[in-house]
Amino acid sequence: MMDLNADLGEGFGNWTLTDDDALLACVTSANVACGFHAGDASVMRRVCDAAAAGGVRIGAQVSYRDLAGFGRRSMDVPPAELTAEIAYQIGALRVFAEAAGATVSYVKPHGALYNRVVWDDDQAAAVVAGVRLAGGAPAVLGLPGSRLLAHAAEAGLPAVQEAFADRAYTPQGTLVPRGEPGAVVHDPDDVVRRSVGMAVERAVTGADGSRIPVAARSLCVHGDTPGAAALARRVRAALEEAGVEVRAFA
């Protein structure tokens, strides 16, 4: 079984970035921007309505408060402040999810925060504290071996491991930083091959050519990648052709 997720609702006002409706037709989980790196109330409500109508699970994609940098700038936010900001974002999205007859099934950090909580124990703990403060028991989605997932498990929350179809990996199993050459995999055929390999063989070829074990229950295709919807459709079709059941983890 493999979940297929994508980042959605990454626009605000009249500005749009992702083809939300097209992506919702082929993913099983939607990482919805909660207003801190992208998204606004109207966008969040529209995406939640569409996701609920299509049976797609809704996840809160929480971020540093960084609209100008699209959440891709690492920030030294005090833990108590970060906890409050995480709870705030989840709470805002939950209003629209519940109004649509659904719920916030999981929480996934975005951008720089996602990478920071792989190794930063204080920020990882603060994010999990924010999830608990918001209430309920949503799953927490993150990189295998991250401090985030360790803290989530310790808090009794479902800790779900994620892999990336269109990102390069270091030999240590972390993501190659976006500023480095080759960090994003642009060749659609390569993305499809890597996706099937991670789902079936549970491994991926790293940036140095080494084989890296991958134990993931969810696979991400970035919604802001050019042609993201068409790529997501190809990935899903290839997974199903390989005998992989594509369904939500939550």
Curated annotation (Swiss-Prot):
Name by which UniProt lists this protein: 5-oxoprolinase subunit A
One GO-annotated biological process of the protein: carbohydrate metabolic process
Summary of the function given for this chain in its UniProt record: Catalyzes the cleavage of 5-oxoproline to form L-glutamate coupled to the hydrolysis of ATP to ADP and inorganic phosphate.
Family per similarity comment: Belongs to the LamB/PxpA family.
Keywords, comma-separated and alphabetical: ATP-binding, Hydrolase, Nucleotide-binding
CDD domains (alphabetical): LamB_YcsF_like
UniProt cross-references to InterPro entries, sorted A to Z: Glyco_hydro/deAcase_b/a-brl, LamB/YcsF/PxpA-like
Oligomer status and interactors: Forms a complex composed of PxpA, PxpB and PxpC.
Species annotation: Streptomyces griseus subsp. griseus (strain JCM 4626 / CBS 651.72 / NBRC 13350 / KCC S-0626 / ISP 5235)
SUPFAM superfamilies linked: Glycoside hydrolase/deacetylase (SSF88713)
Enzyme Commission number(s) from the entry: 3.5.2.9
Catalytic activity annotation: 5-oxo-L-proline + ATP + 2 H2O = L-glutamate + ADP + phosphate + H(+)
Pfam families (UniProt xref): LamB_YcsF (PF03746)
GO molecular function annotations of the record: 5-oxoprolinase (ATP-hydrolyzing) activity; ATP binding
Gene: pxpA
